Amino acid sequence: MWQKLRPPKPEPESVFKAEDDLQALSEAMLDQIVSAPDWHVATIALNGALEAWLNSNQADRQPVVIVGAPHTNNAEILKLWAEEQKWRVIEPPISDDILAQNENWLDQLTDDNTPWVLPSLEWCYLRHTQGLALIRRLFDQLWSDRVSLGVIGCDSWAWAYLRHIWSGRMPLVFMAQAFTHQSLEAWFKTLAAGSDLAPFLFRQQDNGKYVLEPPPELAEEIDPPVEISSFLERLASHSRGIPGVAWALWRQSLLGEFNEALSEEERQQVHQFRATTVWVRSWDQLKQPAFPADFSQTQAFILHTLLLHNGLPVKLLAQLLSLPATEVFQHLCSLQAAGLVENGAELWRVSPLGYPVVRQFLQGEGYLTD
């Protein structure tokens, strides 16, 4: 009797899929399976990390810096946190004021004696002979009784550089914890569970092993016992546990057999009886950016400068490197074609997919890294 009432057990799938039988998922499908992260969740963790500091005696509070690696969305999280706490946000000075050493911007630290958040310290200096005076003055003022309570956010590369050039007293530092393969799995499951097409089974394309453990309601129907792939362990290691890097690589790894022409009613009928299998490229088959054949020392300087400032517009980058803007733009286009940098809102940055290989190269060449 119960067998008649229960949905039929899904037919076993082949333990692997030839890549020719699969296709990369469309952006619309990827947005269903790996949606954009909700950084409001991160503000809860940040609040927990700062709880003791917030509750301490005001006279004993040291200035605080929250350091995050590239693509951790550190500044965005701090802006959300400031909004929740009703603290005012201090935007970075414009580059002309930094180079002119205009200290009027520092007055915001003492305005109204109200608490503040400075989300992007990396945009408050420039690696230039005239570009460090303002941030040195900022560090001096942090310990003044006139400065109201504040939290500073800083990219990890900029923080490494500032520690290198500043020998004075340093603030209290908190660093975002890197994601492990377990936390990546929990995160990816949460993102997928929010889809209208859930539940999903994530299996490695070349051997059929499960990349994410199946949902409990489906695990009991799987025969033979579930074997787990090592994909997430390699992803966590390669991405250095940086959520934005891991998220981009995860999206790139997914393949499917979806018929996106199905109507919503037909999709609901399909998912009434079985989960959708999303196939994951094996780690060795995952295509990652590589340096162009004509990669030059100038391009290495460009990448390093972009990382030290968490992104720059072309003209300012050219000014810092003492190169013609047209030449810098040509180099950026070459690096963009290789997948190493990206451009958005007139700002060039090292891309999430390119970051691991760029960091490894710069570290190997003896550049200052985070």
Name each model feature, range by range.
Residues 243, 248-327:
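Winged-helix-like regulatory helical subdomains adjacent to P-loop NTPase cores
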Residues 122-166, 173-184:
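Sensor-1/coupling segment of RecA-like P-loop NTPase cores
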